[in-house]
Amino acid sequence: MSQCPFSSNPPAEWHNAELNFSDSMSYGDYLDLGRILSAQHPLSPDHNEMLFIIQHQTSELWMKLMLHELKAAREHVRQGQLPPAFKMLARVSRIFDQLVHAWAVLATMTPSEYKSIRPYLGQSSGFQSFQYREIEFILGNKSAALLRPHAHRPELLQSLEASIATPSMYDEAIALMARSGLSIDPARLALDSTTTTQHDPSVEAAWREVYANPSAYWDLYQLAEKFIDLEDSFRQWRFRHVTTVERIIGFQPGTGGTEGVGYLRKMLDTVLFPELWRVRSSL
């Protein structure tokens, strides 16, 4: 019969485990669990609000890791050090996969349950997530208008303004292709970093050359596939976002003032790496 893990006389196999943490760092200390687990403050009396809060808090934690990986990967691409970037981009793709599955947990909330907590949310909305906005900026989907929801937080606004003015991951990849001898229109290389990524024929032609000769451009070829994998996972996350929101609130407006599902459906048309998708039709 197994012994209770909280017994004062632990089983023999526990004898080498540290059990006294009065003078050393414990698991909870290292992870700062005291603050993390006390950061949930439901405003309504409804049981289901805890799910809503934790769903969004954990998403923000995963996005923090995404930003950590994306910024490092972008710097490696800028320096032409692609192998380290591959691991980081693969990790971001798997984080998106994790977030795709997480929607299934929120989808256990019914319309009636959400209706009970919605009045307590005010105008707070995932649309206002500054981390999500920075992820989009790093990946090339930029719009200065999307800085406005953060104007009331000068420190966040300053960070996002710096992010939108910094070349995107894809900009750095295109610059690397030019340095690798592939022909890129100088106008594309001189493009204002604050603009969103648009299709460029010279970039598509360069990627076509890479895909036609993968052994000659192996690292760029691998980078292209990492980008495709990342955007594929991102698209799945966006789609699952739409279906989860529609399942819970239908076509009601979002709390942040957007069209709700209508707005999210428009976001499904966003393409981060347009030439990489277009080139597949001409190989």
Swiss-Prot record:
GO molecular function: heme binding; metal ion binding; tryptophan 2,3-dioxygenase activity
Subunit annotation: Homotetramer.
GO biological process: L-tryptophan catabolic process to acetyl-CoA; L-tryptophan catabolic process to kynurenine
Sequence similarity: Belongs to the tryptophan 2,3-dioxygenase family.
Summary of the function given for this chain in its UniProt record: Heme-dependent dioxygenase that catalyzes the oxidative cleavage of the L-tryptophan (L-Trp) pyrrole ring and converts L-tryptophan to N-formyl-L-kynurenine. Catalyzes the oxidative cleavage of the indole moiety.
Residues engaged in binding heme: H241
SS bond list: none
Bound cofactor: record note: Binds 1 heme group per subunit.
Enzyme class of the recorded protein, top EC level: oxidoreductase
Record-listed E.C. numbers: 1.13.11.11
InterPro entries: Trp/Indoleamine_2_3_dOase-like, Trp_2-3-dOase_bac, Trp_2_3_dOase
The keyword Oxidoreductase appears for this protein: yes
Cofactors, names only: heme
Highest taxon of the lineage: Bacteria
Pfam families (UniProt xref): Trp_dioxygenase
Catalytic activity: L-tryptophan + O2 = N-formyl-L-kynurenine
Pathway(s): Amino-acid degradation; L-tryptophan degradation via kynurenine pathway; L-kynurenine from L-tryptophan: step 1/2
Alphabetically ordered keywords of this record: Dioxygenase, Heme, Iron, Metal-binding, Oxidoreductase, Tryptophan catabolism
Residues where substrate binds: F52, I53, I54, Q55, H56, Y114, R118, T255
Record's protein name: Tryptophan 2,3-dioxygenase
Keyword Oxidoreductase: yes
HAMAP family in UniProt: T23O
